[in-house]
Each structure stands twice: as structure tokens, then as C-alpha cells.
């Protein structure tokens, strides 16, 4: 299924609301947004508002977030693709250290872009944020030596409700940057590495997820 990597140039258009610039429906997928906060810097350092409910509401994104999460991962770690089946979550994600390639896959029944993916590079330098609505699977790959990743959620984590998809499902066709390897019919990380020979590192659970066609039948 078709997908794309997020490439914002200075010429791309976005809606500026207060201290944020919002690009909506990125990749042609309704609801996905890339948010760029205004960064005020000088020779002392910088300041920015990492989240403003007022600015988000003015941009039409008034989301009642209830939980903040933070993770640290080393290079080559791939987490995903995750979703909650009965308690779907909207997520606002960003990298506060290092760099990650962050991906969302549309799982909404009846969506014109069902099965389509979109990816964006989130780094401590570009400070971009990725808003992923309910009804998407989410995952990310760490490209730096380490990365710290933060995200806001509008529902709580329910361990017994977690679902997932194979990160390398050929029907979805995510183009994970710098990953070398050949699909062997499962989500196993065996035989996969980054181009510098760093092994791809997935949890045991994430190597057991099935393909989108095996997981959903509408």
C-alpha cells in the first residue's frame, strides 16, 4: 500500500496559530498533522512552548490529553506498530533527544487511505511534533546513538487492549530509512540491520505481530 516520507520545505504551506505552525492532512491522510513550535533563541540558548492548549484549539485540535509518556531507546531499536483496539488513543509525539523516524498507519475502516502510511523524521534539532489521531497504528525507529521520545495521549494505556501489526508488512510497505534486510514472511528482526551494521532491535512481542490482512477483515 502506498505511503510517503514527510519532507517539509520552506515553500510548503502550514497554518500558523500563536506559537505553532500546523500542517494538516499530511501525506493526503486526513487527521495526520505535523506541528512546528516557534523557537526563540539567542546566544544564551532557546525557549519554546512545547504544548499550548489554546493554540491547538485555535488550530482545530482541541484534544483532552490525559497521559504523558517518555521513553529512552538506543540506536537500531524499532518499537511498533502499536494500537489499542477498544481504547484508541490520539498521540502527540516528539523527540527531545536524538532522532527517530516516526510512522503512522491508517487503520480506520472505510477510510479512503486505509493501510496507507506516513513517516516523519523527528529530531531534537528540528523539534517537530507529529499528531496521530485515533484509528492509527504507530511505531518509530531510532537512528541516533540514543533517543528520548515523549508523547501525549488522550486515553490511558490499557495493557490488555494492546494490538499490533508487523513492522515490515509488505502490503503496507513502510520505507524504514537506513534499514537493510529482506522480508522472510514474519515480523522477526533476524537478518535486518542498519547500514552501519547496527542490528535491528525489536521486542519479542513486536516480532510476533501479523500482517494487516491477517489482523483486520472488514
Annotate each language-model stretch with its function.
Residues 130, 138-143, 151:
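Short beta-strand His + acidic residue motifs that chelate non-heme Fe in jelly-roll/DSBH
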Residues 4, 14-125, 144-146, 153-218:
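Non-catalytic, conserved peripheral segments adjacent to functional cores
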Residues 10-12:
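Intrinsically disordered, low-complexity polyampholyte segments enriched for Lys and acidic residues
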Amino acid at each position: 500500500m502506498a505511503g510517503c516520507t514527510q519532507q517539509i520545505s520552506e515553500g510548503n504551506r502550514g497554518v500558523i496559530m500563536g506559537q505553532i505552525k500546523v500542517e494538516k492532512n499530511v501525506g493526503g491522510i486526513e487527521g495526520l498533522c505535523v506541528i512546528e513550535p516557534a523557537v526563540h533563541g539567542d546566544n544564551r540558548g532557546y525557549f519554546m512552548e512545547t504544548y499550548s492548549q489554546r493554540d491547538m484549539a485555535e488550530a482545530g485540535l482541541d484534544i483532552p490529553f490525559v497521559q504523558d509518556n517518555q521513553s529512552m531507546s538506543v540506536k537500531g531499536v524499532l518499537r511498533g506498530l502499536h494500537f489499542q483496539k477498544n481504547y484508541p488513543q490520539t498521540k502527540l509525539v516528539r523527540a527531545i533527544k536524538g532522532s527517530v523516524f516516526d510512522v503512522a498507519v491508517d487503520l480506520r475502516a472505510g477510510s479512503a487511505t486505509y493501510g496507507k502510511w506516513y513517516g516523519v523524521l523527528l529530531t531534537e534539532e528540528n523539534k517537530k511534533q507529529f499528531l496521530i489521531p485515533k484509528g492509527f497504528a504507530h511505531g518509530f525507529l531510532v537512528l541516533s546513538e540514543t533517543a528520548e521520545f515523549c508523547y501525549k495521549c488522550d486515553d490511558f494505556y490499557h495493557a490488555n487492549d494492546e494490538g499490533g501489526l508487523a513492522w515490515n508488512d509488505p502490503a503496507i510497505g513502510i520505507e524504514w530509512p537506513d534499514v537493510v534486510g529482506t522480508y522472510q514472511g514474519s515480523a522477526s528482526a533476524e537478518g535486518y540491520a542498519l547500514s552501519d551494521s547496527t542490528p535491528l532491535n525489536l521486542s519479542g512481542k513486536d516480532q510476533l505481530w501479523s500482517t494487516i490482512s491477517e489482523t483486520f477483515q472488514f
